[in-house]
C-alpha cells in the first residue's frame, strides 16, 4: 500500500503533488539517516531481534495513524518512521543473514532474500489495488495489522548473535 497507494490516497485528499514529494523525500531522508547513522547503533544495542521488533512497532504506529488521517502535519510526523520500518528492518535482516548463512553462501542468501521480498511486495501491491478500491485510505490499516503480526515473528524468529550457538 505504502508507495503508489499513499500517493493516490493523499492526492484524493487534496494534498498538492509538491507536498506529497516533500513527504516522500522526508521518508527517504530518514531511511538514509538510519542506514548510515543511527541504524548501526540501534542494531548494536538491541541486536537483530530488538531491531526487527522496533521496526514492527514503528510500522504498526505509522500505518495505524496513516489509515485514519490525511493531515499533512500528522503525515510529516509519521514519514520518518520509514527509516525504522524499512532501513532498520533491512539492517536486522542482513545481520541475521550474516549470523546464520555461511560466508560461502552469502550471495545465495541475499538472492533468496531479495527474491522473496520482491515477490511478496508484488503480491501485496496487487492485493493493495483491490483493498484500496474497496476501502480507500482505510486499507492502510491492513498494513498496520501485518506489522502487528510481524512483532512476535520478529521477536521469536530473529535470533541475536549471542543466540547463534543455540541455533546451530
What are the language-model segments listed below?
Residues 1-23:
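Helix-loop boundary and gating motifs at the non-cytosolic
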Residues 34-47, 132:
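Helix-to-loop junctions at the C-terminal end of transmembrane segments
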Residues 107-133:
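A late C-terminal transmembrane helix in Major Facilitator Superfamily
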Residues 130-149:
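A membrane-interface helix-boundary motif in multi-pass transporters
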Residues 17-18, 101-113:
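Loop-to-transmembrane helix entry/capping segments in MFS-fold secondary transporters
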Residues 67-78:
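Helix-loop junctions at membrane interfaces in 12-TM secondary transporters
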Residues 88-101:
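Intracellular juxtamembrane helix-capping segments at the cytosolic ends
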Residues 50-65:
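Structural signature of the two symmetry-related core transmembrane helices
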Amino acid at each position: 500500500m505504502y508507495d503508489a497507494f499513499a500517493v493516490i490516497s493523499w492526492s484524493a485528499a487534496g494534498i498538492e503533488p509538491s507536498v506529497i514529494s516533500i513527504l516522500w523525500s522526508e521518508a527517504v531522508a530518514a531511511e538514509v539517516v538510519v542506514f548510515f547513522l543511527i541504524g548501526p547503533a540501534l542494531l548494536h544495542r538491541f541486536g537483530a531481534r530488538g531491531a526487527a521488533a522496533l521496526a514492527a512497532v514503528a510500522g504498526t504506529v505509522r500505518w495505524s495513524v496513516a489509515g485514519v488521517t490525511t493531515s499533512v502535519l500528522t503525515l510529516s510526523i509519521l514519514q520518518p518512521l520509514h527509516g525504522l520500518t524499512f532501513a532498520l528492518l533491512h539492517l536486522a535482516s542482513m545481520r541475521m543473514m550474516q549470523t546464520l548463512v555461511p560466508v560461502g553462501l552469502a550471495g545465495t542468501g541475499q538472492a533468496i532474500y531479495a527474491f522473496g521480498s520482491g515477490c511478496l511486495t508484488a503480491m501485496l501491491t496487487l492485493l493493495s489495488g483491490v483493498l484500496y478500491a474497496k476501502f480507500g485510505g482505510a486499507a492502510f490499516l491492513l498494513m498496520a495489522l501485518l506489522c502487528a503480526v510481524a512483532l512476535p515473528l520478529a521477536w521469536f524468529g530473529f535470533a541475536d548473535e549471542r543466540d547463534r550457538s543455540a541455533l546451530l
